[in-house]
Design a protein with these regions (language model features):
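Substrate-access "cap/lid" subdomains that shape
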Residues: 91-93, 188, 222, 231-346, ...
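Alpha/beta-hydrolase fold nucleophile elbow
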Residues: 193-206
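Mobile gating loops/cap/lid regions near enzyme active sites that modulate substrate access
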Residues: 98, 384-497
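Active-site loop->helix "elbow" adjoining a glycine-rich segment at hydrolase catalytic centers
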Residues: 126, 174-178, 206-209
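Secretory targeting and sorting signals
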Residues: 1-24
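Non-catalytic accessory segments of hydrolases
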Residues: 25-172, 442-455, 460-467, 492-495
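Short glycine-enriched nucleophile-adjacent loop
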Residues: 209-221
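Alpha/beta-hydrolase active-site loop
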Residues: 102, 171-191, 254-260
Length: 497
């Protein structure tokens, strides 16, 4: 989340144009899109097409402008390398990018011919709205095992995607507009890759899940998808401000607040000055613009209000989280162990007058490091019970299913993290079940991965993930219904919020 969010960032790839091929085939390496032909790669299991432009380069006059149409090309465009990462700073030792020309997507399909159109799954990556890239995620398992077309998309981040300024059309919502441009590309081109434009599932994790919340609330997204999956991005997510005891702040920001924040940025009095700034200089204020804005044409109202009042696209929706979301962030906020004697003071800093009730409900466990208790408290308060609220409120208007990824021994996918009492099923850990991230899974974890891939695919085809429990626990040897609200003490949290 925000500046402390962790994302494994992709290396920047180059794109070239190659000579035209003799013909284009729906199940071969060359496919004709609405703007020109692309040549990808074919393996025994999948076809992959990388760096396909879905909007014009957002540079020069197009910086801080809604995505513009791509100019058609002649010949066959090379699509054998993944999309480059959008401009972003280095986070936790991961590489930065200064690539502003980044509005590309990647397509993965099964290699074999199909006589019927396939469901399409469009992935929106996470990274706190300031980091991440489509090319981080290899969806080969999802595509091949589910006979699906999987599209991973880039969108502008941070100061390039969510900047605002008085008089600037689209202030604070350019990244969301990019996601919609990618979804419109899918509507126009799904069939060329064997996909069914009438059966598109949009799914994402963390900031990607929050993006799905925004698209559910955006009138401009009408008809662009038929199903939605929100992974660890509950629409009403709030986190401690760490400035005022008891104050929690949400993700979404009004357009007026975003424009106020953008006024005078880098000493510029107008947009012409800002558009002339090099990428590297703009990246010095990158993390200041990590909140999508409502009161905009793309997002007219706060998604929290939209979900509560039913002003959403009423499509089948799957909403879930991991059992130990906050363990990923706790060592970033608190790098050193916290003596249990200081537990009460830390809770007072976070919860103000409610700290005593929280401490009584969540006692220390005797390991003389209170960070794991704090992580559990914030997992329940900020992530789990907010996910439960998202399910309940969306469920008044559309069909909603739930899951919780709960493997306590899942491998760590983020390199270089400091020691912590128990990471458990940390934020982002379920990604290992869906994508090939280069980690080795045990046979039992592989079985969970196979189950998750199959049920995500079932949901993409039918809108039904295949279980009847309100919340399905996903863990080795323990796949089945769980009393989620009781486990995460959501009754307690609703009583004090």
């Amino acid at each position: 989340m925000r500046r402390t969010a962790v994302a494994v960032l992709a290396a920047v790839m180059t794109l070239a144009v190659v000579p035209p091929a003799a013909s284009a085939s729906a199940d071969g390496p060359v496919v004709s899109t609405d703007k020109g032909a692309v040549r990808g790669k074919v393996t025994e299991r999948v076809r992959t097409f990388g760096s396909i432009p879905f909007a014009a380069a957002p540079v020069g006059a197009n910086r801080w402008r809604d995505p513009q149409p791509v100019t058609a090309w002649r010949g066959v465009r090379d699509a054998t390398t993944p999309a480059p990462a959008c401009a972003q700073t280095s986070q936790l030792g991961q590489p930065a990018s200064e690539t502003e020309d980044c509005l590309y997507l990647n397509v993965t399909t099964p290699a074999q011919r199909s006589h019927r159109t396939r469901p399409v799954m469009v992935w929106i990556h996470g990274g706190g709205f300031t980091a991440g890239a489509a090319s981080m995620y290899d969806p080969s398992w999802l595509a091949a095992n589910n006979d699906a077309v999987v599209v991973t998309v880039n969108y502008r981040l941070g100061v390039f995607g969510f900047f605002g300024h008085p008089g600037l059309p689209g202030s604070g919502a350019f990244g969301l507009a990019d996601q919609q441009a990618a979804l419109r590309w899918v509507q126009r081109n799904a069939r060329a890759f064997g996909g069914d434009a009438r059966n598109v599932t949009v799914f994402g994790e963390s900031a990607g899940g929050l993006s799905v919340c925004a698209q559910l609330a955006s009138p401009r997204a009408a008809g662009l998808f038929a199903k939605a999956i929100i992974q660890s991005g509950p629409c009403g997510l709030t986190l401690p401000s760490f400035t005022t005891p008891g104050e929690f702040t949400g993700v979404w920001r009004s357009r007026a607040d975003t424009e106020k924040a953008g006024t005078g940025t880098l000493g510029c009095a107008d947009l012409a000055c800002l558009r002339a700034k090099p990428v590297a200089e703009l990246l010095t204020v990158h993390e200041q613009f990590a909140s999508p804005s409502y009161d905009t044409a793309v997002l007219p109202i706060d998604p929290v209000i939209a979900q509560r009042t039913g002003r959403i696209h009423r499509v089948p929706t799957l909403v879930g989280s991991t059992h130990d979301e906050m363990t990923l962030f706790a060592p970033l906020f608190w790098p050193q162990p916290i003596p249990e004697s200081a537990y009460g003071d830390q809770l007072a800093w976070i919860f103000g007058a409610d700290a005593g009730e929280v401490a009584a409900r969540y006692p220390v466990n005797g390991n003389d490091d209170a960070r794991d208790e704090i992580a559990r408290v914030l997992t329940d308060r900020s992530w789990a019970c907010t996910s439960q609220t998202t399910r309940a409120e969306l469920g008044r208007y559309t069909r909603v299913s739930g899951y919780e990824f709960a493997d306590p021994d899942v491998p760590m996918i983020f390199p270089g993290f400091p020691p912590f009492p128990d990471y458990g099923a940390y934020h982002g850990s379920e990604l290992l079940m869906l994508f090939d991230l280069g980690q080795t899974l045990t046979p039992a974890q592989r079985q969970v991965s196979d189950y998750v891939i199959a049920e995500w695919g079932r949901f993409a085809r039918t809108g039904d993930p295949g279980w009847r429990a309100p919340v399905q626990s996903l863990a080795p040897g323990a796949i089945g219904g769980t009393d989620f609200a009781l486990d995460h003490q959501c009754g307690f949290w609703s009583s004090i919020l």
